[in-house]
Amino acid sequence: MDYTLTRIDPNGENDRYPLQSQEIVSDPLDAHVHRSVYMGKLEHALHDVVNWGRKNSLWPYNFGLSCCYVEMVTSFTAVHDVARFGSEVLRASPRQADFMVVAGTCFTKMAPVIQRLYDQMLEPKWVISMGACANSGGMYDIYSVVQGVDKFIPVDVYIPGCPPRPEAYMQALMLLQESIGKERRPLSWVVGDQGVYRANMQSERERKHGERIAVKNLRTPDEI
């Protein structure tokens, strides 16, 4: 079977994976509120209820690429108990999964397979890039490793580390839940490209910058 690797052009328009849909300048429901306070508030409440159900029942697709996958499945143990976030139901089929975790090194031969699995997932769907190798190729700056999975599929949350700890994976789940809670997706039964509106997500460095600068008393190295 022949595979073709579709590379995303950040500066161009791609009907298959539109990067411009990842950003939004304003919430489209604000206009509804101004036109009709009652219907606008009702639509806000309806979106909140739907998003609450989506973010608290995230089913991951069960596949791994390398060592980061071991850290991912460690979060399913009783010590961490990822079931608190509604993400303990591993799916063996991409058609039944809500989000994909690209955990580990993505080789060039594996990239078209990942892309096909992503295409088989049903909307709404999200992607978490776990580990330095999945984020940017890591220490493998060679011809056989893709330098970041966002070269061919859209990524919602990045997890740094080599490999990241299970706590980092759980934090990524909480960030994804926060992002899903602010999404505005069509509530129609019609299946198709109707536009998805997402709030701009700040990086953890920007979000925690003020808190880190305000710290005056640093902990000793044996406490970190």
Curated annotation (Swiss-Prot):
Gene3D superfamilies under this entry? 3.40.50.12280
Organism, as annotated: Proteus mirabilis (strain HI4320)
The entry describes its oligomerization and partners as: NDH-1 is composed of 13 different subunits. Subunits NuoB, CD, E, F, and G constitute the peripheral sector of the complex.
Gene Ontology CC: plasma membrane; respiratory chain complex I
Query: Which EC number(s) does UniProt give?
Result: 7.1.1.-
Q: Which cofactor names does the annotation list?
A: [4Fe-4S] cluster
A GO molecular function assigned to this protein is: NADH:ubiquinone reductase (non-electrogenic) activity
Keywords of this entry: 4Fe-4S, Cell inner membrane, Cell membrane, Iron, Iron-sulfur, Membrane, Metal-binding, NAD, Quinone, Translocase, Transport, Ubiquinone
Among NCBIfam families, the record links this protein to: nuoB_fam (TIGR01957), PRK06411.1 (NF005012)
Designated name of the protein: NADH-quinone oxidoreductase subunit B
Give me the reactions it catalyses.
a quinone + NADH + 5 H(+)(in) = a quinol + NAD(+) + 4 H(+)(out)
**Record's bilayer topology term:** Peripheral membrane protein
One annotated GO biological process: aerobic respiration
What is the recorded function of this protein according to its Swiss-Prot or TrEMBL entry? NDH-1 shuttles electrons from NADH, via FMN and iron-sulfur (Fe-S) centers, to quinones in the respiratory chain. The immediate electron acceptor for the enzyme in this species is believed to be ubiquinone. Couples the redox reaction to proton translocation (for every two electrons transferred, four hydrogen ions are translocated across the cytoplasmic membrane), and thus conserves the redox energy in a proton gradient.
Cofactor stoichiometry and binding?
A: Binds 1 [4Fe-4S] cluster.
Where does it localize?
Answer: Cell inner membrane
- Where is [4Fe-4S] cluster annotated to bind? 67-68, 133, 162
Which SUPFAM superfamilies does this entry report, sorted A to Z? HydA/Nqo6-like (SSF56770)
Q: Which family does it belong to?
A: Belongs to the complex I 20 kDa subunit family.
